[in-house]
A protein has these predicted regions:
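Asp-based, Mg2+/Mn2+-dependent phosphohydrolase catalytic module
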Residues: 1-9, 22, 36, 81, ...
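N-terminal helical cap/lid subdomain that shapes the substrate entry/recognition surface
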Residues: 3-102
């Protein structure tokens, strides 16, 4: 995976190092008693996430709006205070279910043993993501942590990848970025001059012809 010219590796967090699906399903079960609406939730998440990436809405307001729209689609119109209450319940359940993928720490530590510098680049609210990194013992694994909610820039914008490279003291061409989203992670990193690696844990994806990125199915 790591060629000789690589001096640093950056990682996405959710669905790359942290099992996003498991914790998100736990949040749905808190709200509905079941996670049968997982597919619907994913579609709604992608729709709202686009607005966040476009700078149309902040991360935490986006989460509340998603919850409001989710229940509206199910015929339940929530007042703002009830939206907040349910989103807080959901978030608490998600936090209780945070866990790393089994290959996350072995990968990070193997790269560290090779002398590589490491960074996390994640699109999320700062407080939420730092709490997650602390709870899972990830903070100490990274030389730099870049969170969109703290910086005002998000993947796939080139600026956040290049800022990570500066923090690590490397040129973009000396860095690799690994993430589960083809567009936001792998292609975004490529466009910023890094080596983009798409982590497709499901094995169901396909790299577009001539994309100039790599694809892996697991971290270690």
């Amino acid at each position: 995976l790591v060629s000789p010219e690589i001096a640093a590796v950056c990682f996405d967090v959710d669905a790359t190092l942290v099992d996003y699906e498991a914790s998100t399903r736990a949040g749905l079960r808190e709200l509905l008693g079941t996670d049968d609406a997982w597919a619907e939730w994913c579609v709604l998440t992608d729709q709202h996430y686009e607005g966040y990436l476009a700078g149309q809405i902040g991360f935490e307001p986006m989460l509340r709006q998603r919850t409001k729209d989710f229940f509206a689609r199910r015929g339940e119109l929530l007042c703002e205070s009830e939206v907040v209450r349910r989103e807080e319940r959901r978030t608490a359940a998600v936090r209780r279910a945070w866990r790393l993928f089994d290959d996350a720490l072995p990968c990070l530590r193997a790269l560290r043993n090779l002398g590589l510098r490491l960074a996390a680049i994640t699109n999320a609210a700062g407080e939420l993501q730092r709490a997650k990194l602390d709870a899972l013992g990830l903070h100490a694994e990274f030389d730099a942590v870049l969170i969109s909610g703290e910086l005002g820039i998000a993947k796939p914008h080139r600026a956040i990848f290049r800022r990570a490279c500066r923090a690590l003291g490397v040129r973009p061409g000396q860095a690799m970025h690994v993430g589960d989203r083809l567009d936001t992670d792998a292609l975004g990193a490529r466009d910023a001059g890094l080596h983009g690696v798409w982590l497709d844990r499901s094995g169901s994806g396909m790299i577009p012809q001539g994309a100039g990125i790599s694809m892996i199915g697991q971290l270690a």
